[in-house]
Design a protein with these regions (language model features):
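Domain-length accessory/inserted modules outside core catalytic folds
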Residues: 1-83, 87-157
């Protein structure tokens, strides 16, 4: 979701994202309040690193997904969830398919297609591993393409 908000050019991307994911603990519980402060600090750090990866001079975005040691199904479900979050964020930022150029419109449709995949019969295997690796790389490039079109192009104009 955070990547989608940043790539869509939402002016308050981090704040909107934090409002969606911020943990809520009972007030008056000092341990919970300390945990909340630490969690928020960690989330803010993640937001800064994500923005730096997207906006930095090098292609440094790292899509936050389970490691390759995780089962294939778990990683595929995380990709599915990442795509849903990215598309949800575009909607929050007011970006629809009609607002996109040909390339990003195609990427938008591809991301949407990923959210409709049936992961129920996904088998472990080299072919599926290779396909998932390609999709993960596609996500990274897709996010950068959205940012280039929605944000960077306006900054350079």
């Amino acid at each position: 979701m955070l990547c989608g908000l940043i790539c869509a050019g939402h002016p308050q991307a981090e704040g909107v994202w934090l409002a969606e994911v911020e943990p809520v603990f009972p007030q008056g519980d000092l341990l919970a309040e300390a945990a909340t402060r630490q969690c928020l600090a960690d989330l803010n750090d993640l937001a800064k690193r994500t923005r730096a990866g997207i906006e930095g001079p090098e292609i440094g975005l790292r899509v936050l997904l389970p490691t390759e040691e995780a089962p294939l199904r778990e990683r595929a479900e995380a990709v599915y969830d990442w795509c849903r979050g990215f598309l949800y964020a575009l909607g929050l930022a007011g970006v629809g398919e009609r607002d996109l150029s040909g390339d990003t419109r195609e990427v938008f449709r591809d991301l949407s297609d990923i959210t409709r995949l049936d992961l129920g019969d996904l088998d472990e295997g080299e072919e599926n591993e290779a396909a998932l690796a390609e999709i993960v790389e596609f996500l990274r490039v897709a996010a950068m393409l959205f940012h280039k079109e929605r944000v960077a192009a306006r900054e350079w104009a």
